[in-house]
Amino acid sequence: MSTVHASTHPLVLHKLSRLRDKNTEPKKFRELVREIAMLIAYEATADLATTSREFDTPLARMTGQELKEKIGLVPVLRAGLGMVEGFWELMPGAEVWHIGLYRDEHTLRPVEYYNKLPLEPRVSVCLILDPMLATGGSATATAEVLKRWGVTKIKYVGLIASPEGIRAMPTVNIDISALEDILIIYVNQLIEELNLSFSNRTLLCYGNVSSVR
């Protein structure tokens, strides 16, 4: 099964509550999305591999650590764009690629309409950024695109998620022996229903999120 990590950090919980408050103004909402994204970026990258390197300090030569894995950010258009800035605060060198999806009105299946991925991946880890994991359709479809592209480690990073969305993620066709290594879902809070006020505010700030579900 996929590993689900729900943040319990007091700052995340505090800011998430303000984010979902119906009285939060759009400008403040955007700021909170950026701030929460930065906080969960710290948690979502806790398992990145590092390697040793030597360098000189003002006093002596020493051995330290640097990231071994290159990271790519994949915001699902358009709602995921609001999370990119928060991640860039911690990893300014991360490359960003965009994948656009919309839901077919007849089949209710996600349809890819935008994909500007390079011919071959230049990173070892891809983080799918999407604030709200609703049915899991767009997240699963994005993961499938990245798998076909050749990425070996994929993580979903979001703000809130529904149980339905969580359950949908294991249906991705992944080698079961490597499931936990390949697909890890990071969310701030698991909710029984999608929060309407959050959806409306996402609509205000990032465009029609229903078009990418």
Describe the role of every protein-language-model region.
Residues 1-213:
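PRPP-associated nucleotide enzymes
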